[in-house]
A protein has these predicted regions:
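Sec-exported extracytoplasmic/periplasmic mature domains
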Residues: 10, 100, 149-152
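Active-site neighborhood of glycoside hydrolase catalytic domains
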Residues: 1-59
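Aromatic/acidic polysaccharide-binding cleft in carbohydrate-active enzymes
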Residues: 48-146, 161-166
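Active-site proximal loops enriched in glycine and acidic residues that flank catalytic Cys/His/Asp
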Residues: 25, 48-51, 107-111, 186-188, ...
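Carbohydrate-binding surface patches
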Residues: 152, 162-203, 207
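Loop/turn elements at helix/coil->beta-strand transitions in domains of secreted/extracellular proteins
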Residues: 16-19, 41-46, 101-106, 156, ...
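Generic recognition of flexible, low-complexity loop/linker segments
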Residues: 33-37, 93-97, 170-174, 185
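Composition- and surface-driven signal marking solvent-exposed, interaction-prone regions
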Residues: 33-36, 61, 121, 162, ...
Length: 209
């Protein structure tokens, strides 16, 4: 992808019309690629513009449309509650990684879907942070409070600051907001709670993640 961008940006007339680059999450983590783009084009925006769970709300089946148009259900052993939790963890992991490598904006493909995971232009159904019931009311999936927490820590105009994490179970991203407050997001990937010591400006904060 970087090679394609480089080729496009080599055209001066085309490059002057580019404000930034959009990217998705579907083929795995590409955090290093974001950092390379940030280094190459520091004046351009990096915006995550599409991601969503690949199953209907409250359903542990992944939905996919085959080439012949027949809908396939790919069953798994996860319960809806388990897969909702894994969705939320995937969102947090992706956002933390993107923030740490130069992302400046994040957009979900489906902020709201109906109970069938639609409407969609192709077969199947997708999940979302919010689901609209038949009477028009909204209910939150587990993804929503994760997004709330991250958006509350990284407010518009925030500047990412350096951090270091000891160990592999806890992911972190930190920033300074325009009002001078420090925002910190921690994601515990372990199966159990862990104690976290946060050192900042010579002070120590003990928390549980």
């Amino acid at each position: 992808a970087i090679e394609h961008i480089d080729a496009f940006m080599a055209d001066a007339a085309a490059a002057e019309k580019v404000d930034g680059f959009a990217f998705h999450w579907y083929s795995g983590d590409h955090f290093e690629a974001l950092e390379l783009l940030r280094g190459r084009y520091p004046d351009k925006l990096l915006v995550h513009t599409e991601s969503c769970p690949l199953h209907m709300p409250g359903n542990a089946l992944s939905m996919s449309a085959a080439e012949d148009g027949v809908l396939n259900s790919i069953s798994g052993e996860q319960t809806p509650a388990m897969i909702d939790h894994s969705d939320a963890m995937a969102y947090a992991h992706d956002m933390i990684g993107d923030l740490n490598h130069g992302m400046q904006g994040w957009i979900d493909w489906n902020m709201i879907v109906d109970r069938n995971g639609g409407p969609r232009h192709v077969m199947g159904g997708f999940g979302a942070p919010l689901v609209c019931a038949e009477d028009g009311t909204l209910f939150e999936t587990l993804i929503y409070p994760y997004l709330q927490l991250i958006a509350g820590a990284f407010r518009p105009g925030a500047v990412r600051i350096g951090k270091s994490v000891y160990g592999r179970d806890v992911e972190a991203a930190a920033c300074i907001n325009t009002d001078g407050t420090c925002g910190l997001v921690l994601l515990n990937q372990a199966a159990e709670t862990v104690s976290v010591n946060i050192r900042i400006a010579g002070r120590l904060i003990q928390e549980v993640a």
